[in-house]
Design a protein with these regions (language model features):
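Extended beta-strand/beta-hairpin segments
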Residues: 1-59, 70-166
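Alpha-helical metal-binding/catalytic segments enriched in His/Glu/Asp
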Residues: 64-65
C-alpha cells in the first residue's frame, strides 16, 4: 500500500506545503485546518502573493512573542490593552548567524516593573527558544502524497486571492 503513489499520507499535526501551480514559486501552506500563500517577490520570479520563507519565520517569531506576552499579562491580571511585535531578519552572509530584531510595543497603563517583566517574558516564547538554540532537521523522501495536497485546494480560491491583491 505504501508504494502506491495515489495512497495518501495522513497529515496529523504536520504543516503541508504544496505548489499552487498558479505561479512558479507560489506555495499553499496548510496547517491545522488553515491555508495561506507563501511566495517570493516578483524581483526573484515569484508573484509576490504572500510572505517569503524568511517572512514566515519572522512572522512565527512575532506571533509567538505577542501570544506569550498576552497570555502572561492575562494570567497576572495586568492592564495590557494591546501588544504589537515587529520583526526584521538580517543575514550578512551565508556563513554568518542570522539576526532577528524584535521591537515590542506594549499599550496600556502598565508600570515600569510590568513592562520590564513582559520584555523578559518575550525571551521565553517557544519559537524564540527554538531559534536561539538551533534545531536538527531530518529529511526523507516519501513515495506517498499527503492528503491535503491531493485535494486540489481550490485553484479558484487562489485566483480570487491573487485578484484581490491578498
Amino acid at each position: 500500500m505504501a508504494s502506491d503513489p495515489f495512497v495518501h499520507q495522513d497529515l496529523g499535526e504536520s504543516v503541508l506545503v504544496s505548489e499552487s501551480r498558479l505561479g512558479r514559486l507560489q506555495m499553499v501552506v496548510r496547517s491545522t485546518g488553515y491555508a495561506f500563500l507563501a511566495d517570493e517577490p516578483r524581483s526573484v520570479g515569484g508573484l509576490g502573493s504572500g510572505p517569503d520563507p524568511y517572512g514566515l519565520l519572522a512572522g512565527a517569531l512575532g506571533a509567538c512573542t505577542a501570544m506569550t506576552i498576552r497570555l502572561y499579562a492575562e494570567r497576572q491580571g495586568w492592564p495590557l490593552e494591546r501588544v504589537q511585535v515587529s520583526v526584521q531578519h538580517h543575514r550578512a552572509s551565508l556563513e554568518a548567524r542570522d539576526l532577528f530584531e524584535r521591537s515590542i510595543y506594549l499599550e496600556g497603563p502598565l508600570d515600569e516593573a510590568q513592562r520590564t517583566r513582559l520584555m523578559e517574558i518575550a525571551e521565553r516564547c517557544p519559537v524564540h527558544k527554538t531559534l536561539d538554540r538551533g534545531s536538527d532537521i531530518r529529511t526523507s523522501l516519501t513515495p506517498v502524497m499527503a492528503q491535503a495536497a491531493a485535494e486540489g485546494a481550490g485553484s479558484e480560491h487562489m485566483r480570487d486571492m491573487e485578484q484581490a491583491g491578498i
